[in-house]
Amino acid sequence: MRVTNRSLKGREGEIAVTAETLDDLWHLKYIIEKGDMVFALTRRKADSASDKLRPEKVEKVKVRLGIRVEELEFHKFANRLRIHGPIEHGMDTGSYHTLNVEIGTNISIIKEHWKNDQLQRIQDAEEAGKRPKVVIVAVEEGDADIGFVRHYGIEVYSHIRQSSGKRETGLRNEFFREIVEQLRHAVPEDASIVIAGPGFTKEDFLKYFNETESEMASKALTEDTSMIGMSGFQEVLRRGAVDRIMQESRIARESSLMEDLIREISMDGKAAYGFADVKNALGYGAVETLLIADETLREGREKGEDIDKLLMEVEQAQGKVVVFSTAFEPGEKLHKLGGIAALLRFKVTG
């Protein structure tokens, strides 16, 4: 994400950004909220007297509109964020319009009060653009999966299969060649690659990779996993391979924190989950790290709950706040625990 303008007076004002990746569109879903004013260039029908006589001739013109946000929808597979609401600035004031925000779109977001997590998201998205991207190749004999590590989770790019019963050297090399060919088309120049899987197939593939695409292969490392597919991708994250490449990776951090939380809960230790228990622990000054699901945060704000007051109290008590993605496994687990939990400085009873 690229910030093109920042004009804040205290916590009020405008920040203009350009979405550079699909991850940025996902971030914007949780930065923009109902009631915000959003400006962007868009296309809208320009009616005239002659147009009404010949409706088939009505053309859309490019205009800059400001809409008051009522609804947001992130369409991952269409690579766009749809922002819907009434027009307050520009042509056809009072009419409803939908802004389709795509990669490369510049938008201005105006808020009466920017919240800490929203400003942090923008900072994280800016920094993420400067960090290496990570691609995971999970491979075993005759089967391979390629996945991209995104902020919202793992995006499965492709599955490659070699027909069973055909493991001759020539056919095996053809299988490896297909994997390399897909990586050539899909992987950015600055990306790092984790080659994972059970057995020795991954080492054999890395050798072939080095022989055929040495520059790209120089950014690859191997990691043992018990399986391939999505479970293999998650295993790579748990084992820390992605963390070694992207030490600030949101996904790796959330996986680690969730493991800590589950371990503490299983031992009846320094953990709290559910709004009531977390608030009780906060009253004792025990909250060291607050874990909250992005959907819980968004829904709480829409319902007018005191969710931001809780976050502020955690920060005032020198605690940390981590917002989890519910599109990723740790966030799903957190959501099932009530959407909010905390790792504590000390155990709280009662």
Swiss-Prot record:
SMART domains: eRF1_1. The lineage of its organism: Archaea, Methanobacteriati, Methanobacteriota, Stenosarchaea group, Methanomicrobia. This is Protein pelota homolog. One of its GO terms (molecular function) is endonuclease activity. Its cofactor is a divalent metal cation. It holds the Pfam family eRF1_2. The N-terminal domain has the RNA-binding Sm fold. It harbors the endoribonuclease activity. GO terms for cellular component: cytoplasm. It comes from Methanosarcina mazei (strain ATCC BAA-159 / DSM 3647 / Goe1 / Go1 / JCM 11833 / OCM 88). The keyword Hydrolase applies. Its EC number is 3.1.-.-. It is found in: Cytoplasm. May function in recognizing stalled ribosomes, interact with stem-loop structures in stalled mRNA molecules, and effect endonucleolytic cleavage of the mRNA. May play a role in the release non-functional ribosomes and degradation of damaged mRNAs. Has endoribonuclease activity. One of its GO terms (biological process) is RNA surveillance. Belongs to the eukaryotic release factor 1 family. Pelota subfamily.
